[in-house]
């Protein structure tokens, strides 16, 4: 499952290894309970709102950057998680990495009271830049 705590931890470690960070992979988890509840919450909320899988993945990105479960690399981790979930669905993000990073940074800045609007806006951005992967 692309939103399991173990998968999210793997992507945080990859982000720290690739881009560096002050936390170090071994002690990077700041809030394990938020991380463990993330998948269940995202599934519940997406079902409650009637959201599709892309919107659900965007909610996961929002939750990762807002809950900040790691000492470092939360935004980078959220990006990796999103791209992995899309890949597992047979989709590729075709936009520029820089634009994706900017959109994730914008999520961090949003008012928590506008979570639904923020997630939907982010999902529209993502959906407009998706392509089915050619799997041979």
Language model features by range: what are they?
Residues 1-136:
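FIC/Doc superfamily catalytic core
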